[in-house]
Design a protein with these regions (language model features):
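Loop-to-transmembrane boundary segments
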Residues: 235-258, 349-381
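Long helical/loop segments within the catalytic core of UDP-sugar-dependent glycosyltransferases
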Residues: 38-74, 87-175, 180, 186-187, ...
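Membrane-embedded multi-pass helical conduit in multi-pass membrane proteins
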Residues: 252-341, 366-436
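Short, well-formed alpha-helical segments that are part of the catalytic scaffolds
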Residues: 1-10, 62
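Active-site donor/metal-binding and catalytic loop motifs
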Residues: 3, 196-210
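Catalytic donor-sugar/metal-binding loop of nucleotide-sugar-dependent glycosyltransferases
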Residues: 182-201
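The conserved acidic donor/metal-binding loop of glycosyltransferases
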Residues: 26, 80-84, 185
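Acidic donor-binding segment of Leloir-type glycosyltransferases
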Residues: 6-56, 98
Length: 454
């Protein structure tokens, strides 16, 4: 958090036009540490305020709404606590929002960079996935004129949109308040912009259980937004392609229960003698898409060295299969309207191999889903054995992906849980309940930005 406060205080922007708020819901010594850092910068002429809440009403959305009510700026920049915005962030985003032709632009989303992409195989896989999302998916949606979402951090909002009664401001009825707000804004005529050339690096979770928690929240929140906005989205006077793409975007995590269902029905189908080889052979052509997506993203970012991170695609595939059980639970909870608290993703300020997160008090403990993953991994191996004995060898490689994915989740989860067992936890790097964001309120433009490539 102090790292973020330092970065915001050093943004290249006139200090009389810059107001920094640290939105703090923590319940430990984090508040005192952040207040000390804020006082340090106030003594140097920077407006920094710590807004601490005793009750986490509305979680992140509630904290952002409270911050907005006390802000004076025309524009609101939002950064999660683990991000480090570059000094020129505002000079490259504010002028775009102030151009006369961009009066309807509600928000600007920068590309997420990575502070620790090479920390481990897990962070390399996540970096590969995030690069594909921003460089291909976000850029592609913008180029096609489709609706796209605000990612919750490293972005800039126009206050007029946040206070537009047609939009409704920050709402806490989903776990993805950022995605919810950006879709509601675009459905009443506001627009968004994605700037690939403006990069704000953030920390990638180095712990598998923290990554699972993050994915669970994103999966549940996205489906909550789908359930909330799908009827309204379908009634928009937009081209059919844009409406369909919006529904597919909001429902992207529905793939996980479908993956789980596919595994479960495979064994009964094999025992019944079903042979769906040819239909699946044609459908399998779609599997070419994801490798191309990630290859294009790495080629765009790293040129001739694109293949070095793309080589982690098999591990990323295993992760995706292994997440299907946990994320299916998230989808089910969203569809059945089960409320759960906002569980933040702990970050540990580790950047290079050898730096330790395992002794942090905020390491995520082992959760019961690991036993479900163990059972499903065994089920997948049994299904592979049945496929081989029945001569259905074509299905074995696909089923082995499930076994490898669940096995990876179980073994890595158990190993990291043992490394982070309570007796070894002595260091504190972050707050248990600090919201993901720290907003910066801005009152006006400074200079013109560099033109984005897209």
């Amino acid at each position: 958090v102090n790292r973020l406060v330092d970065a915001c205080a050093q943004l290249d922007y006139p200090r009389d036009r810059l107001q920094i708020q640290v939105l703090d819901d923590s319940t430990d010594e984090t508040t005192a540490a952040v207040r000390s850092r804020a006082a340090y910068w106030r003594q140097r002429g920077v407006q920094v305020a710590v807004l601490h809440r005793e009750r986490r009403h509305g979680y992140k959305a509630g904290a952002l709404a409270q911050g907005l009510s006390l802000a004076s700026g025309e524009f609101i920049a939002i950064f999660d606590a683990d991000f480090v915005p570059p000094p020129d962030f505002l000079r490259r985003t504010i002028p775009l929002m102030t151009r006369p032709e961009n009066r309807q632009v509600a928000f600007v989303q920068a590309r997420w960079g990575h502070l620790n992409p090479d920390y481990s195989w897990l962070t390399r896989c996540q970096a590969l996935a995030l690069d594909g999302h921003f460089v291909v998916e976000q850029a592609g949606r913008q180029a096609a004129g489709y609706t796209f979402g605000f990612n919750g951090s490293a972005g800039l909002w126009r206050r007029a949109c946040l206070e537009d009664p047609r939009v409704g401001g920050w709402q806490a009825d989903t776990l993805c308040e950022d995605l919810d707000l950006s879709y509601r804004a675009q459905m009443v005529g506001w627009q968004g912009r994605f700037l690939e050339d403006v990069v704000a690096p953030g920390e990638i979770p180095p712990q598998l259980l923290a990554f699972k928690r993050q994915q669970f929240r994103w999966a549940k929140g996205s489906v909550q937004v789908l359930r909330k906005l799908a009827p309204r989205l379908w009634r928009q006077p937009w081209p059919l392609a844009r409406r369909l793409q919006g529904l597919v975007h909001l429902g992207s995590y529905l793939i996980h229960p479908l993956l789980l269902l596919l595994l479960i029905v495979s064994l009964p189908l094999l025992l019944a003698g079903a042979d769906p080889f040819w239909p699946l052979a044609y459908l399998s052509l779609a599997s070419v898409g994801p490798p191309l997506l990630y290859a294009l993203a790495q080629r765009e970012l790293h040129g001739r060295r694109w293949w070095r991170r793309w080589a982690y695609l098999p591990l990323l595939t295993f992760l995706g299969m292994g997440l299907s059980f946990s994320n299916s639970r998230a989808v089910w909870q969203a569809l059945t309207r089960q409320d759960t608290p906002f569980l933040r993703t702990p970050k540990f300020q580790v950047r290079r191999p050898g730096e330790s997160w395992q002794r942090s008090l905020y390491a995520v403990p082992l959760d019961p889903t690991i036993w479900g993953e163990l059972a499903l991994g065994g089920y997948a191996l049994i299904t592979v054995a049945v496929a081989v004995t029945k001569g259905q060898l074509w299905s074995a490689p696909f089923l082995l992906l499930y076994a490898a994915g669940y096995g990876l989740m179980v073994l890595t989860g158990l190993w990291q849980a043992w490394q982070a067992r309570p007796g070894r936890r002595t260091q504190v790097h972050a707050s248990r309940s600090l919201p993901r964001s720290s907003p910066v309120e801005l009152t006006g433009p400074v200079s013109q930005p560099q033109p984005p490539r897209r």
